[in-house]
Amino acid sequence: MLKFTEEHEWLKIDGDVATVGITEHAAGQLGDLVFVELPEAGSTFSKGDTAATVESVKAASDVYCPLDGEIVEANQAIVDDPSLVNSDPQGAAWFFKLKLADPDAAKALLDEAAYKELVA
């Protein structure tokens, strides 16, 4: 199941684990990324908490945790090469995997059609 937030994160949900990243729209707005800071595995976050930080040539921005949960994995590849976020934001450049405290809460997030309407 693919879901989106109004803060421009995407979530690919598989059971009780969500893979989280930023959308193509967000990556395009940021411009070329030069730095990514990710949360550590084992960290817990509530919905809306700052979970990661990205810096581009234009600005620094926070990436918010879309739902309550625990980080089970972070994508070291985008720390090593932040430009991956610009080239494949909704694929190889995922940010972290989140074990959801309440998987049903994802139903309240935007579907792809609603997100496309938001950024149109």
UniProtKB/Swiss-Prot annotation:
Residues 17-99 form the Lipoyl-binding domain. InterPro entries: 2-oxoA_DH_lipoyl-BS, Biotin_lipoyl, GCV_H, GCV_H/Fam206, GCV_H_sub, Single_hybrid_motif. CDD domains: GCS_H. Binds 1 lipoyl cofactor covalently. Keywords: Lipoyl. Its cofactor is (R)-lipoate. One of its GO terms (biological process) is glycine decarboxylation via glycine cleavage system. GO terms for cellular component: cytoplasm; glycine cleavage complex. Pfam families: GCV_H. The modification N6-lipoyllysine is found at K58. Belongs to the GcvH family. The glycine cleavage system is composed of four proteins: P, T, L and H. The glycine cleavage system catalyzes the degradation of glycine. The H protein shuttles the methylamine group of glycine from the P protein to the T protein. This is Glycine cleavage system H protein. It comes from Sinorhizobium medicae (strain WSM419).
